[in-house]
């Protein structure tokens, strides 16, 4: 019995340290529920709106978000799916409009947008698409009208337009071409008519 006593005491201590924890809104409705160990959230936690509807299903490890996280609108539709690692956004992520259509998708690296991201109109058509480096838009970007036709495209440097850009009407026909420098229009810009003929439009300093 003497040899087993330390094991018994340790077991009791562990049980006391790990416990289900429930928080409530001021109105008395449940706010969140999950497991805590030494006052740190661990495992699966559910969070709720004041209405009682589920707002999030989160996963913790030693008090930090870790793994797949899901968020919901008050009407119950899925709002977002994120991957966290050691309390930072990592890997793929998906966000949705309240009606259910995909709003945007892409990748995170240490809480910052990284790589290709795509954004969508509520009707499901692509809104814009481009690359990020350390959270900043760079490289070739395309923007689209709500009905799906290409609107404009060009290069971004540090989040600003740079070099040649092309603009299209809602039927997909080329409308304007010109250049940018650090987000400002420069040089001679051209305009295209319905027959596709180019003419000088405006000179920028």
Residue ranges and their predicted role:
Residues 16-205:
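Glycine/tyrosine- and acidic-biased, solvent-exposed loop/turn segments at the edges of beta-strands
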Residues 1-21:
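Bacterial Sec-dependent N-terminal signal peptides
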């Amino acid at each position: 019995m003497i040899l087993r006593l330390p094991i018994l005491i340790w077991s009791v201590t562990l049980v006391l340290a790990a416990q289900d924890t429930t928080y409530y809104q001021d109105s008395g409705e449940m706010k969140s529920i999950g497991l805590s160990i030494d006052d740190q959230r661990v495992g699966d936690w559910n969070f709720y709106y004041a209405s009682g509807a589920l707002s999030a299903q989160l996963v913790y490890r030693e008090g930090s978000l870790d793994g797949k996280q899901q968020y919901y609108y008050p009407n119950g539709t899925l709002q977002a799916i994120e991957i966290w690692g050691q309390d930072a956004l990592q890997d793929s992520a998906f966000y949705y409009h309240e009606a259910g259509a995909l709003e945007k998708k892409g990748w995170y690296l240490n809480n910052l947008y990284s790589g290709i991201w795509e954004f969508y109109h509520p009707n499901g058509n692509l809104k814009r698409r481009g690359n990020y480096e350390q959270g900043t838009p760079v490289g070739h970007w395309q923007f689209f009208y709500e009905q799906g036709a290409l609107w404009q495209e060009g290069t971004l440097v540090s989040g600003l337009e740079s070099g040649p850009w092309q603009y299209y009407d809602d039927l997909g026909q080329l409308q304007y071409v010109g250049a940018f420098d650090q987000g400002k229009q420069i040089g001679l810009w051209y305009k295209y008519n319905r027959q596709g003929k180019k003419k000088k439009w405006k000179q920028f300093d």
